C-alpha cells in the first residue's frame, strides 16, 4: 500500500449580493458564490469582494467555512513538489523591511 500524505485544508464559501435600483426601488441581486482557501471572517470576505467588484454596491451575506482532510500519495507529491531552499541569514537581513527610527 502506498504511503499517503494528509493535510487538513479549510476553505470558505462567500455568498455575496449586489444592490441594484429597479423602478426607483433598491433590490438585492444574488451574485455567484466565491470560494477561498482559509477561514475568512465577514470583514475579510467583505474586503475581498469590494476589491473584486470595484465601485459596485456589494454586501457579503454569509461566510461558510468548511474543513476537509485531503490526501495524496507521497510519490505523486514528490512529482509535483519543489524543494524548499533555506535562505542564508545574510540574505534574510537584506530582504527584511527596515525598522522605523524614532525621532529623539
Swiss-Prot record:
Alphabetized GO MF terms: DNA binding; DNA-binding transcription repressor activity
Disordered as annotated region, ranges: 85-104
Pfam families: p6 (PF17548)
Ranges of Acidic residues composition bias in the record: 88-104
DNA-binding region, residue range(s): 1-19
Substitution effect: residue 9 to T: Deficient in dimer formation and viral DNA replication
InterPro entries, per the entry: Histone-like_p6
Biological process, per Gene Ontology: chromosome condensation; DNA replication; DNA-templated transcription; regulation of viral transcription; viral DNA genome replication
Keyword Lipoprotein assigned: no
Induction: Expressed in the early phase of the viral replicative cycle.
UniProt GO cellular component terms: transcription repressor complex
Keywords: DNA condensation, DNA replication, DNA-binding, Early protein, Repressor, Transcription, Transcription regulation, Viral DNA replication
Subunit structure: Homodimer. Homomultimer. Binds to double-stranded DNA giving rise to multimeric nucleoprotein complexes. Binding specificity for the viral DNA is based on supercoiling, the viral genome having a negative superhelicity lower than that of plasmid DNA. Interacts with the DNA replication protein p17; this interaction optimizes the binding of protein p6 at the viral DNA ends, thus favoring the initiation of replication. Interacts with the late genes activator p4 (via C-terminus).
Domain notes: The N-terminus is involved in DNA-binding.
Purpose of the protein: Histone-like nucleoprotein that binds to the viral dsDNA and responsible for wrapping and compacting the viral DNA about 4-fold. Forms a nucleoprotein complex in which the DNA adopts a right-handed toroidal conformation winding around a protein core. Binds ito most, if not all, the viral genome, although with different affinity, the highest one corresponding to the genome ends. The formation of the nucleoprotein complex at the genome ends, activates the initiation of viral DNA replication. The binding of p6 would recruit the complex formed by the TP and the DNA polymerase to the origin.
Homology family: Belongs to the phi29likevirus histone-like protein p6 family.
Name listed for the protein in its UniProt record: Histone-like protein p6
Organism: Bacillus phage phi29
Organism taxonomic ancestry: Viruses, Duplodnaviria, Heunggongvirae, Uroviricota, Caudoviricetes
